[in-house]
Amino acid sequence: MRVILLVLAALVFPAAAQEDMSAKTWLNNMSQALRDKEFKASLIQLQAGHVRPLVYLHGIVNGQEIAFLEYLNGPPKNAVRVGNTVTFIEHDQAPYSVVAGRLQGIWPAAFAGDIGALETSYQFILGGRSRIAGRPGQMIRLLPYDNSRYGYQVWLDMETYLPLRFDMLTEDRQLLEQLMVIELLELQEPPALLLEAYKHEWPPVIDQAERQEGQNWQFAWLPKGFSVLIRDHHRLIGSHEAVEYIGLSDGMASISVYVARAGSSPLPEELLTRNGLSLVTEKVGNAEVVALGKVPMETLSRIAKSLTLE
């Protein structure tokens, strides 16, 4: 009887301790788990009326984070991260590598980073608990302080602190996008696939195109918490004209801004919002600006109009 009571106490104590944890503590534990744990997650992504199954592997090999993301439907498409290098492998083009700290297309990069940096833009609120993928989960809401971005909610596994479900919501709580784990396996060692990825000779990181003199575009306004992450040149599909590309993020939402000489490139003309992904076009002086991102259309329009050339 004494042994049984000790076992029950060992099971109850962690859950009791979790009752006193703040929403930020839960998120900090998630951040550490995403960086440090060895695991395999099978997921489904609901986006724009489509269901997309994914498999995500994560592990540590010789002190380096290794991750692998596979899209299970459609043409083969994978992404591999070794340290801060991400390589994209697609069926219709040669593999290529870029510098990136996390894999895109799954959880927000901020989830594995400094959670405190999100506090300037989002309020963390502890929600209820529910069962997801056969595991008890604690829900945390991330509510924006203004209407320039959407809100989010995430359910964390109460044992591993890994995310089990992630929702993007409008101000009136309409679901725009969802990522849900259907099976989560915590591993004791890196799977063979990640060991091979660590040893493999991936393509070198591609060089950014040289920036043209005078193309110093600046923003007179950005929503609080957003900053410029990258600047380079892109070539639009079907066009030989280079356009200026500026990538913005607040850690949760990402925005892409494209700038071209008016009439030089076939930029989209319509305004649209579809399942959280918005697109706007604006004319700024002699330039055409396209802004694309999972934020309200009004935010994109204001960002595009605030561009100035210095």
What are these regions (language model features)?
Residues 12-14:
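N-terminal signal peptide c-region/cleavage motif recognized by signal peptidases
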Residues 18-94, 122-130, 136-139, 143-151, ...:
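N-terminal mature ectodomain segment of secretory-pathway/periplasmic proteins
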Residues 51-55, 148-152, 164, 176-178, ...:
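Short, surface-exposed coil-to-beta transition loops
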Residues 133-200:
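Gly/Pro-enriched, hydrophobic low-complexity segments
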